[in-house]
Amino acid sequence: MFWSILAVLFVVPLVALYFVVIRSVDRYMPEPWWLLFLCLVWGAVGAVVPSVVGGLLGQEALASALNPQHTEQGVKLVENTAATFLAPLIEEPAKALGLLAIYFFSRRRVHETHGPLSGMVYGGIIGLGFTFTEDILYIVGAAEQVGAAGFFGVYFLRTILLGLGHATFTAFTGLGFGLFVTSQSGWRWAMPLFGLLLAMMAHGGRNLFSSFLALEGAGILFALMIHGLVVVLFFSLLVWLGFRDRS
């Protein structure tokens, strides 16, 4: 209980900061607070539940398929495979369901124009909700294993250095939904799927370098580089779309 409370106290301020930064980009036609709150709740609860269940079932299936030896290397093989290939395939669609619900709901009830910028903001907030719950689970797990060193090590890596990861991934899916709403192209139906594919690729690529390719820390460095590039792209798109909507 102590580690859980401490994790919440440490994670909440950063998630709140990320929330304010993402929302502040869309000042011209800001999304309603209640809808952003629902996005946060979906990411923190709605998307986490199927992700955890699917992840556990998937790891069991991988363990049966790979049939690793009951050694540290065998366990690591299953964990790395799940992180690189399984997690993106489960977590990104789970988060995308929130965006799908927003689209169908807002068609009838919300009158704001949900274009690419709004889609990225909604996706980013859903991702932050997911980060909130996932980071607490990982931080508490590390603390229970190795104490304070595990707590602060995982907190620094996941919440500070990689804290915007899920927000950027799901924002790509949101961009696809936003383009679907505003585009007149015959390919508009494929745009949410393309955004989801980008989200899964970015997610899997980052996890690849932090798992299979984590060679004496080099993989972590590359993971941080990929994360940094994705975050720069994320905010560049947000700013550009924000200026475009004002003009």
Regions found by a protein language model. Name each.
Residues 1-247:
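Hydrophobic alpha-helical segments at protein termini of multi-pass membrane proteins
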